[in-house]
Amino acid sequence: MGENYALELRDISKSFGSVQANDHVDLTLRKSEILAILGENGSGKTTLMNMIYGIYYPDEGHIFVNGKEVTIRSPKDSYELGIGMVHQHFKLVDVLTAAENIVLGLPGKRKLDMKRITEDIQKLADKYGFELNLSQKIYEMSVSQKQTVEIIKMLYRGARILILDEPTAVLTPQESDRLFDILRNMRKDGCSIMIITHKLQEVLALSDRVAILRKGKYIDTVETAQANAQSLSEMMVGGRVDLNIDRPEPENVKKRLVVKGLNCKNKEEVKTLDDVDLTVNAGEILGIAGISGSGQKEFLEAIAGLQAIESGSITLLDDNGKGTELAGMDSISINKAGISLAFVPEDRIGMGLVGDMDMTDNMMLRSYRNGKSPFLDRKGPKALALKIKEQLEVMTPSISAPVRQMSGGNVQKVLVGREIAQNPKVLLVAFPTRGVDVNTSHVIYRLLNEQKKKGVAVVCVIEDLDVVRELCDRIAVFCGGKISGIEDGRTATKEEIGLLMTKHEKGGTQA
């Protein structure tokens, strides 16, 4: 055991039934380093991190912290060993302040000296360069501020080993840069950091070393300075990967969807869309960018009939320019009317697919929604399930297995495959590659481009600004429920889009 290792895993294995999630994995984390963990969906990254954090317990193997073998059976054990984990979905209480969330659940006296505690937390925040109002309620915060609370919470509890799961998934470029500066400050102070991410450019910019997993097995750990995006992706998938994203020129562009004066409110009567005007063309991919909660999700759901509309119009135009008004129609009415619209929601299992159903039954959901008899011939849906499994290389033991057992990337392939099989005129896709590995991401990009070439109007909410600029013809940027600008995907910079996402407007046009 090297004495400079903060953490070492030896021969770690974990299975769930017949599925081998981790297969005799060895891994080391040095003191004062940032280690990136890379792997395709289903490679075992999250399972491995969850064993370090105490959510799962390994079937075999040994874990060492600072040279001593340890047993971690719960997050409480990991806290006591100085290990903290910030999950992609934050675990905060919205009605409490930042300071209250940070101390929530700590052992000690019932009555806390919050003035002294707040001063201590502020010193910790200042030490690493965090910017945070400790008296602010969580529900008043941006996503990046909530993430800051989670990180400080772990540091305040004594974490010197920090695990971050997809830390930049919903951050702007400027927020990501600030986070990286903070993580570098933590490294200088002796913290050891592990990051799970699919963004290769961030791995290359931030990490000291990169560990690669493939199908549950440990492949290698390489020095970041000696790696590049191509070499890392090839180790992840075991073969050559084309990292280029095609963007064919739009052909026969015509108006397909015209949105005017669209206003929506949520259940709390808070405005989520504020007088939105947008035209979507057939034969193009329109990207929707914005900080999480800026109205992108509500915009797609309003078009799909899943969001109540306060006012405004959504007009679907046919090839002759004749319009059908969608405003006021729910999703069932849209399907019954035979309107050719497909929607891939953010919530893949729940809103998109039923986790306990197999692929065939999930193909049949379309028929149920159309109001047809549930006593259907399963031959057609089964054939479609087999076609999607084969053509999109869906990794599943069988099309009869519940989709809940699949990795996120394979679930997304099934969902996208089912929706495009409807031959839609309009395809709405929310976060098509969120949490999806590089290989699966490029499968999704290819499918979207195929729809574009067929003349489909494709609308995508995309959080990765590199991808939105490479894939999309136009980019509509949402900020606070409004469109702050529309940019040409071929000429827009990340900085310009990032500024529009945070209300610093640069002139954009709809042309």
Where are these regions (language model features)?
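Glycine-rich phosphate-binding loops of nucleotide-dependent enzymes
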Residues: G2-A511
